[in-house]
From Swiss-Prot:
GO terms for biological process: defense response to virus. The gene is cdnG. It comes from the Bacteria. The keyword Nucleotidyltransferase applies. Its EC number is 2.7.7.65. This is c-di-GMP synthase. Cyclic nucleotide synthase (second messenger synthase) of a CBASS antivirus system. CBASS (cyclic oligonucleotide-based antiphage signaling system) provides immunity against bacteriophage. The CD-NTase protein synthesizes cyclic nucleotides in response to infection; these serve as specific second messenger signals. The signals activate a diverse range of effectors, leading to bacterial cell death and thus abortive phage infection. A type I-D CBASS(GG) system. Bacteria with this enzyme do not have other c-di-GMP synthase enzymes (no GGDEF or EAL-domain containing proteins), suggesting this second messenger has been co-opted for CBASS signaling via STING activation. Keywords: Antiviral defense, GTP-binding, Nucleotide-binding, Nucleotidyltransferase, Transferase. Belongs to the CD-NTase family. G05 subfamily. It catalyses: 2 GTP = 3',3'-c-di-GMP + 2 diphosphate.
Amino acid sequence: MLITSNAKTQLEDTLAKMAEAAELDKTRWSRLNTAYEAISKWLSDDPEFFGGVEIEIYPQGSVSIGTTTKPYGKTEFDLDVVIHIKLLSSNYDPKTIFNEVVRRLNENETYRKICEPKSRCVRLNYQGDFHLDVVPGCMVIIYNHELIDITDQKNEIWLRSSPKGYQKWFLDIANRVELTLLEMTFSAHKVEIEEYAKKKPLQRAVQLIKMRRNIYFDQNPENAPTSIILTTLAAQFYEGQSSISETFEGIISKLKNHIETLFPNRPFELPNPVNPSENLADIWVDKPELYKHFISFINNLHNEWQDLKKAHGIEEEAILMKGMFGNDPYIKAMEARAETVNQKRGNGLGILATGVMVDRAVEKSLPVMPNTFYGD
């Protein structure tokens, strides 16, 4: 973690560490990979329906684009994986495919205990780790490995989707910036770039927006905007900024202006960027009150960010950041900072009140840039 008196860089570092604290950790990543590989093997070994059928299983949603966030006040993550069954959807009805997946999972004693069929997925509840929503689907066209028809067994229809296409669309936008502000700062200080600093500003901004969403709607989660709405809008309003703070502010400010200028009283459509015929915000048509909650959330988020920019001193900034993004992520970010300071001191480095890090062994000092805060 970076230690600097530059307020903009220090804020950037704190935001990144807070987002990292709320994301899927390496241990659960490993368990997730093990879980969906086991599911794939169990289906493929089916002697009745799936035996001999090619099955590809892969993550979708936040897992695939690097924007996972733990639900507020809970220990389990909500994660999605796709079971891409290489059978043409035109040859089967969705209910048959869905029921065969449920049937096969229930033949396994472990899965039977944690299996919960939903409308479009089968949820596997891995206690203390994550809820894994397994989404079955079939090929639309032979040799097209992105397009998929997923099952909606409740309405007995196929729903066109492209999880891989959406992943590519989002990551192409996120990767418009080659080096993040944190990467450049690490390099300027001739320090090895830590992994948390390499995640793109758009990914971090989406994580932070969802973290604030989870807290804001904690008492009424049914009113919260979906992650796909927030993620898609964030990517559409992103302009390639290299810092998390500029990305966050740019997205929220542009979105607020978009609403006030064009859609103050009625919901707007949000076409799926990889399937334009699908309106990702169709729920606002059926439940317009949810759009009002969305507007209130964006306005509140904008106002809170402006307050954070005007914060005077560490204590005020801490109160605002914990209120926006959660107490635990902030504490973990500060613990990481304290650990870094202790390591530097143990290596013979001292940090002066001026923000200069001193190497006492060779009596050299590394100056830190003047104190400037983003937006001032």
